[in-house]
Amino acid sequence: MEKKIIFLVFLVALLALPGFISTEVIKKDTPYKKRKFPYKSECLKACATSFTGGDESRIQEGKPGFFKCTCYFTTG
């Protein structure tokens, strides 16, 4: 019984591994002209509309800069 549980845990981990490897995080800048230093929430919305068609769940992080936002998002 214990060997079956260990085997199932190993199998699930093995099946989940390609999903972690296949996602690529991309870093791109997008201009933000409404504010000199935008809020983080404004950067997340700007990144989502610029690169993912409004899908905020694919945005990892949005870092504010001087009239820009640095966006980290996943493909797929």
Swiss-Prot record:
Record keywords, A-Z: Disulfide bond, Ion channel impairing toxin, Potassium channel impairing toxin, Secreted, Signal, Toxin, Voltage-gated potassium channel impairing toxin
Tissue specificity: Expressed by the venom gland.
GO molecular function per UniProt: potassium channel inhibitor activity; toxin activity
Compartments (UniProt record): Secreted
GO biological process: venom-mediated vasoconstriction in another organism
Residues marked Important for inhibition of KCNQ4 (site): K27, K68
Signal peptide boundaries: 1-23
Chief localization: secreted
Region (Important for inhibition of KCNQ4) location: 33-36
Any one Gene Ontology cellular component term annotated for this protein: extracellular region
Domain of life (superkingdom): Eukaryota
Outcome recorded upon mutating E42A: No effect on inhibition of KCNQ4
Record flagged with keyword Secreted: yes
Effect annotated for changing R35A: Severely reduced inhibition of KCNQ4 (IC(50)=104.7 uM)
Protein role: Blocks voltage-gated potassium channels Kv7.4/KCNQ4 (IC(50)=2.5 uM), Kv7.1/KCNQ1 (IC(50)=2.8 uM), Kv7.2/KCNQ2 (IC(50)=2.7 uM) and Kv7.5/KCNQ5 (IC(50)=2.7 uM). Targets the pore domain, in particular negatively charged residues 'Asp-266' and 'Asp-288', of KCNQ4 and probably other KCNQ channel family members where these residues are conserved. In vivo, shows vasoconstrictive activity resulting in acute hypertension when injected intravenously in mice. Also induces coronary vasospasms ultimately leading to heart failure. Induces seizures when injected into the hippocampus of mice.
General remark: Negative results: does not inhibit channels TRPV1 and TRPV2, voltage-gated potassium channels Kv2.1/KCNB1 and Kv4.1/KCND1, hERG, tetrodotoxin (TTX)-sensitive and TTX-insensitive sodium channels in DRG neurons or voltage-gated calcium channels in DRG neurons.
Domain notes: Has the structural arrangement of an alpha-helix connected to a beta-sheet by disulfide bonds (CSalpha/beta). Since the toxin contains only 2 disulfide bonds, it is called 2ds-CSalpha/beta.
Protein name (Swiss-Prot/TrEMBL): Mu-scoloptoxin(15)-Ssm1a
Species, as recorded: Scolopendra mutilans (Chinese red-headed centipede)
